[in-house]
């Protein structure tokens, strides 16, 4: 239960075996390759051109082409997925994810059948887009010309007249209708109304051939807009034709949509191909991290110590003596670069989420997750503390884990909350609370033992702070910073223990013997901080540093006060739940089992959500500030081995 021990791994092999080796390493997913050109021992050889990257110009061009293929396939997947028949959420969660062995995925991808698939699907999508565009254009034309349906002549026909000319268009419709009246009164114009609306009138306007310029100027002055219509058919016939085209194109759309909706197999093929391309791309990009001569290639990376023997056997079986493998222990100068892989048992592993939310530990730090799991388990349960809420959370998450096919990260989250549900139920037993109802077997009553709960909260805080300070001291001992180990860690553990003994001796009868022990324990270690500060600084100015350190006692008091939220949130959740029950009890007997039952479910669902949210946030806050602040630095980088892509496909072993 700790940070997994790592080793540096070096491989030397013939250049001809590079692709095969990278493929083998990817299938095993045990090595994180690092960039040799960034390491001092290799930089001189790179600068002298003794070594180069095995990624040739042809490889670079192939990588660019590979990235284009990835983009095309991913774009088609995203385009095609919305056309698939919509599945119910629960049904989708129950379905097995796509899976394939790594060897089968490689065999599938090497066929490179995405070209045919993409061509076929692009053609279908073009047909669909074209049909939809035709429908949109036709509907736009119908909307524009529908008001002209009664028109029995076209602009083209009017242009063939010899003795009279005509214009077709609209004039504004105003409240006074002065424009229409003025045009109708004009002696040289003959107006035939086609339609009228709230905003305009549609007219065919006839005039003598020789008056064209004068008439056009007159009409423009009156806001006349000529109809844009070039068809030889009258609008009624043209509109009927457009409606027929819409029906034809809607049939095309329906047929094409049916084809696309039946393309689940093609979509799955694209997903297989996408993960193949991503895996291939990862291997090609890994070549830029290596070093090579004309005939040999060198590769270095990180591997978990526990995996070295199995990898050695695997390479021996696949490559024999053609691959030279060496491992080296991690040195102090490597600490900042070593990737971090946490290894914990099934009960502790879900709480890695809390640690990772803050930061992974550095390689020289201990994994705090085992202790975090204990504290967070207690804190969360104490802040929610209801048997019903806890059982519901555990049963719901357990059902989801048992029934649904979930991604590893999602399953880990659900296991986390399932364990927290147990804590909530246990603390519910302590407080005797079941959906806000007070049970007869309460060990501590939230209504009459508030002071007991407050003291318990402070005690938990005191223990948390002491453990954090002790771990901080141990960390500095490992780093051989003994001054800081005492001043910021062990001394404060003893001072706080002394203050605790002093308080207990004064409060509890018959415990007065603890008073002098606690007093001198605190005084001697306070003096010890001053002495160690002066000695370590080798001058009297260290006294100021020591005094400032002693001033931190106010900060520890603040830490203990912060833990009173364990009481506050626990009592508030119980009080709100109890108040909701009182509201439901106000209903008459029949109403309690109808509207009252529904109200009970809704109100407790709200209280449950807010209680879980508060427990999650404030529990994390207590861990991050009051606990991690005493010893934990963090900042580690996650272990990311070369492994198969699993964006869409689960790789089977």
Predicted segments with their positions:
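Long, charged N-terminal accessory/stalk domains
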Residues: 1-372, 400, 407, 414
């Amino acid at each position: 239960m700790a940070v997994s021990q790592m080793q540096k791994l070096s491989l030397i092999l013939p250049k001809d075996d590079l692709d095969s080796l990278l493929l083998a390493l990817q299938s095993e997913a045990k090595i994180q390759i690092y960039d040799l050109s960034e390491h001092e021992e290799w930089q001189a050889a790179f600068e002298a051109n003794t070594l180069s990257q095995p990624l040739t110009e042809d490889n670079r061009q192939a990588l660019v082409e590979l990235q284009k293929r990835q983009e095309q396939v991913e774009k088609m997947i995203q385009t095609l997925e919305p056309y698939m028949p919509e599945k119910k959420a629960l049904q989708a969660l129950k379905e097995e994810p796509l899976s394939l062995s790594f060897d089968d995925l490689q065999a599938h991808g090497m066929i490179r059948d995405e070209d045919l698939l993409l061509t076929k699907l692009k053609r279908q999508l073009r047909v669909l887009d074209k049909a939809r565009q035709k429908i949109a254009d036709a509907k736009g034309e119908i909307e524009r010309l529908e008001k002209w349906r009664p028109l029995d002549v076209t602009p083209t026909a009017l242009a063939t007249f010899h003795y009279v000319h005509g214009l077709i268009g609209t004039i504004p419709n105003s409240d006074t209708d002065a424009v229409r009246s003025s045009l109708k009164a004009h002696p040289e114009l003959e107006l035939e109304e086609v339609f009228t609306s709230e905003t305009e009138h549609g007219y065919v306007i006839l005039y003598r051939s020789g008056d064209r310029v004068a008439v056009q100027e007159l009409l423009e002055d009156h806001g006349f807009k000529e109809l844009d219509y070039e068809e030889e058919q009258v609008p009624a016939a043209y509109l009927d034709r457009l409606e027929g085209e819409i029906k034809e194109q809607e049939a095309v759309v329906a047929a094409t949509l049916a084809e696309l909706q039946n393309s689940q197999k093609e979509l799955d093929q694209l997903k297989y191909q996408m993960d193949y391309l991503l895996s291939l791309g990862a291997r090609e990009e890994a070549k830029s991290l290596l070093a090579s001569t004309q005939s040999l290639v060198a590769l270095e990376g990180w591997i978990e110590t526990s995996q070295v023997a199995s990898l050695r056997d695997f390479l021996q079986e696949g490559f024999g003596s053609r691959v030279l493998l060496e491992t080296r222990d991690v040195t102090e100068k490597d600490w900042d670069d070593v990737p971090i892989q946490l290894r914990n048992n099934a009960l502790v592993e879900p709480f890695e989420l809390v640690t990772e939310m803050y930061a992974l530990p550095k390689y020289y730090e201990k994994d705090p997750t085992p202790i975090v799991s204990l504290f967070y388990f207690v804190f969360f349960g104490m802040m929610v503390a209801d048997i019903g809420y806890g059982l519901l959370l555990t049963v719901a998450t357990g059902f989801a884990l048992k029934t649904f096919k979930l991604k590893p990260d999602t399953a880990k989250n659900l296991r986390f909350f399932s364990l927290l549900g147990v804590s909530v139920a246990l603390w519910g037993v302590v407080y005797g609370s079941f959906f806000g109802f007070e049970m007869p077997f309460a060990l501590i009553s939230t209504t009459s033992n508030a002071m007991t709960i407050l003291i318990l909260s402070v005690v938990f805080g005191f223990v948390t702070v002491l453990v954090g300070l002790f771990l901080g001291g141990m960390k500095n001992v490992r780093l051989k910073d003994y001054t800081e180990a005492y001043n910021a860690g062990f001394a404060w553990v003893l001072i706080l223990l002394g203050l605790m003994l002093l308080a207990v001796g004064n409060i509890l009868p018959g415990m007065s013997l603890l008073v002098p022990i606690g007093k001198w324990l605190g005084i001697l270690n306070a003096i010890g901080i001053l002495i160690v500060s002066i000695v370590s600084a080798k001058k009297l100015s260290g006294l100021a540093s020591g005094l400032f350190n002693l001033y931190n006692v106010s900060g520890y008091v603040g830490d203990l006060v912060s833990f009173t939220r364990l009481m506050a949130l626990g009592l508030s959740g119980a009080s709100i739940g109890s108040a909701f029950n009182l509201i439901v009890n106000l209903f008459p007997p029949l109403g309690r089992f109808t509207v009252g039952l529904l109200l009970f479910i809704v109100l407790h669902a709200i209280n449950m959500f807010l209680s879980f949210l508060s427990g999650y946030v404030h529990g994390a806050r207590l861990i991050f500030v009051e606990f991690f602040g005493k010893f934990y630095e963090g900042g580690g980088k996650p272990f990311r081995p070369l492994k198969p892509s699993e964006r869409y496909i689960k790789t089977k072993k």
